[in-house]
A protein has these predicted regions:
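Bacterial N-terminal signal peptides that target proteins for export
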Residues: 1-7
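Intrinsically disordered, low-complexity segments enriched in polar/charged small residues
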Residues: 8-9, 68
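A broad detector of short, well-ordered amphipathic alpha-helices
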Residues: 7-8, 81
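Bacterial N-terminal signal peptides
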Residues: 9-17
Length: 108
């Protein structure tokens, strides 16, 4: 009897607990202006996926010098949960070891 009640309680908790289905992808995007591929991590909320997809705003998260495209997922592992809760697409491009990308002295 106790095992059954414990099992039912566990199943109820699983059914009631919120589930987050945001999709985390690591992509290579071709940049014609930089003449190279740029690695990007994209966190897409469930609301922007599937047959009933809706438009969602995007926030670009830029890492600091020495980081990479996966830095923000390491800093904030709950980004998929936030994406689902707020309906936001997070885009995390890899800027390599640069301060900014539009330098006239270094176009690459």
């Amino acid at each position: 009897m106790k095992k059954r009640n414990l099992l039912l309680a566990a199943l109820l908790l699983i059914l009631v607990a919120p589930s987050f289905a945001a999709k985390v992808d690591t992509l290579l995007i071709k940049s014609p202006s930089m003449n190279k591929d740029v690695q990007v991590v994209v966190v897409t909320p469930d609301a922007a996926l599937g047959k009933k997809a809706v438009a969602c705003p995007a926030i670009y998260l830029l890492h600091g010098y020495g980081g990479n495209a996966k830095t923000w997922i390491g800093i904030k592992p709950n980004l998929p949960q936030i994406a689902d809760e707020k309906g936001i697409i997070f885009v995390c491009p890899d800027g390599k070891n640069s301060w900014y990308w539009d330098s006239p002295k270094d176009p690459s």
